[in-house]
Amino acid sequence: MKKRTWIACIVPAALALLCTLLPQRMLSQRVALPYQAFMGKLTAHTNVPVGEVIYLALGALVLLLPLRAGFLCLRDRSWLPARRLIGQALCALCVGMLAITLLWSPIARTKTLPAPLPSRLPRALYDLCDHLMAQAESLSGSMDDSALTSDQLIDAAQDAMAALTGRAPVVKAARYPELLGKLGLAGVCFPLTGEAIVRGDLARVLLPFVAAHEGAHQLGYGSEAEANLIAYRALQLGKQPLRYAGAMFALYYAMDALKDADPAAYAERTSALSQRVLSDFDRLIRFQRAATGLRAGVLDAFLRLNGQSGRTAYGLMIDYLLEADAP
C-alpha cells in the first residue's frame, strides 16, 4: 500500500486509541451526547431513517467494490486493484473504529444512574415476579383492544419517554426491517445520525419496549440495563397497551432470573399464567433467543468491548427493580 494509504489508516486508528485512554465521562458529556443531540434535531425533520440510508449505501459498497476490483484485476491482469481495495477497506475499518470510540463507547461506558446493590434474595425475587405477573394479567387484553398502528405505538413510546425524561427521543421505523432482522437486531441506536431505528414489523407486544429502549440509548442511557429500566418506567406512564408491553418485558427478565435461582418456583409461576399472557411470554422468549451463533457472538463481543457484561447486561435491570422495591 502507498504511504498515504498507511497514513489514512494509522491516523484514525491512533485517534481511536486515544479516545479509549481519555476519561469516558468527559467524552460522553462534551462530545458524544452534544453531537447526538445536534444530529437528532437535524434528522428529526424527516421521517426517513437517515442512518438506514447510510448503512444500506455502505452495504451496497461492500458488495459492489469487490466485484469492481475483481473485474479490474482480470481486465488488467494485475493484483493492483485488489491491493487498493484492501487498503481502502482497512481505512474504512479504522474510521469506523474511530466513530464508535468517539460517538458511542463513551456513552455506553458512562453510567447515568447510580449502580444498584446486586441483591437477588429469593423472597424479593418471588415478590417482584408476582407483582409483574399481576400487572401483566390486569392489562392483558389492552393490546388486543387497542387500534394503535405500529407507527402510533412508536410515537406513543416517544411521548412516554418525553414524559419521564423531559426529552423526546428520535425513534423511527426502518423502511427495510428485514435487514435488521437478518443481523439479529430488533432496533439500533445510530449515533452518527442521532437516530434510534427499530423494526416496525415487530409484534405489537414487543414494539413499544424496543422503541423506548433504543430511544433511551439515543438520549444517552448507554448501559443496556439502564436503557431497559428507563424504557420500563416510561411505558408505565403511557396508555394501557404500553404499560402491558413494559410489564411483559420486565416479567421476562424477572422470571429469567428466577429460573436460575429456583427452577421449581419458575415452573410454578409460568403454569399459573393465563393463556393470553403465556402466549406473549413465549413470544418474548423466542424474541430474546433469536440471535444465535455468529450473530450472538458478535453482539456479545460488541457489548463487552463497550464496557458491559455481554448479553447478560440486559437482565441487570432486575437489580434496579429489586432495589426500588427493597424496604
Model features per residue range: what roles?
Residues 273-327:
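Pan-zinc metallopeptidase signature
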Residues 5-19:
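Alpha-helical transmembrane segments
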Residues 60-68, 80-114:
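Transmembrane alpha-helices and immediately adjacent membrane-cytoplasm interface residues
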Residues 47, 207-228, 232-233:
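Active-site recognition of the HExxH zinc-binding catalytic motif
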Residues 128-132, 222-263:
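Post-HExxH zinc-binding segment in Zn-dependent metallohydrolases
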Residues 141-194, 200, 204:
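Auxiliary, metal-adjacent structural segments of Zn-dependent hydrolase domains
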Residues 28, 105-127:
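Alpha-helical transmembrane signal-anchor/signal-peptide segments
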Residues 15-71:
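Membrane-embedded alpha-helical segments of integral membrane proteins
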